[in-house]
A protein has these predicted regions:
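Conserved SAM-binding loop of SAM-dependent methyltransferases across substrates and taxa
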Residues: 1-10
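Conserved SAM-binding motif I beta-strand of class I
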Residues: 14-20
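S-adenosyl-L-methionine
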Residues: 30-66
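Conserved acidic residues
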Residues: 69-70, 100
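A conserved beta-strand element that flanks and buttresses the S-adenosyl-L-methionine
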Residues: 73
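A short, conserved alpha-helix within the catalytic core of class I
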Residues: 80-93
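Conserved beta-strand signature within the Rossmann-like core of class I S-adenosyl-L-methionine
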Residues: 97-110
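Rossmann-like AdoMet/SAM-dependent catalytic core
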Residues: 122-168
Length: 168
């Protein structure tokens, strides 16, 4: 859990998880297991304050919650979404009052079960305003661990990673 690692290194950081409701349960479970003494809170509207150490927003409620973050991180889940859902995330990221950063690491291209092809380059990047700091094939996320030698296997396709400074 990347959020737990960030919290361990930067203890004053507030973590906001945005995920599908069922998957968010696992985020909550493992974060709570790592940090049982800290505050964990489900956020569903603007009436819920993002004051807990760990805040959880169901993706289904993303457009109903206004939040601020210094950095957004997405690893290997936008490749599972259609463009309409990806667009909601990008809208939320770009509606920040502060200059935020977005780190994204996903497959260059993936065909979803319904046959739709999702391409990293078409996610909703704003070339004229966002400042790209890193944009390359990801050197650390081309393989995944398995239980037999050589204990890793290549993903079905290459992963791209990009770090941008979001300009409002």
């Amino acid at each position: 859990m990347l959020g737990c690692l960030i919290k361990k290194i930067y203890p004053n950081t507030k973590i906001i998880y945005i995920n599908l409701g069922r998957t968010l349960l696992f985020d909550f479970y493992y974060s709570r297991k790592c940090f049982p003494q800290l505050n964990h809170r489900l956020i569903r509207s603007n009436q819920d304050c993002l004051l807990a150490d760990f805040n959880y927003i169901e993706a289904e409620y993303l457009d109903q919650v206004i939040f601020a973050s210094d950095i957004f991180i997405n690893i290997s889940s936008m490749q599972e979404m259609d463009y309409e859902v990806i667009s909601k995330y990008f809208d939320a990221f770009h509606n920040q009052d502060i200059g935020s950063y977005f780190y994204c690491c996903n497959r260059v291209s993936k065909t979803l079960p319904d046959g739709a092809e999702i391409n990293f380059s078409e996610y909703g990047w704003v070339a004229n305003s966002d400042q790209t700091l890193i944009d390359e094939l990801c050197p650390w996320h081309q393989n995944f661990p398995v239980n037999w030698p050589p204990f890793y296997k290549k993903f079905d396709g290459p992963h791209q990673h990009r770090l941008v400074r979001l300009i409002k």
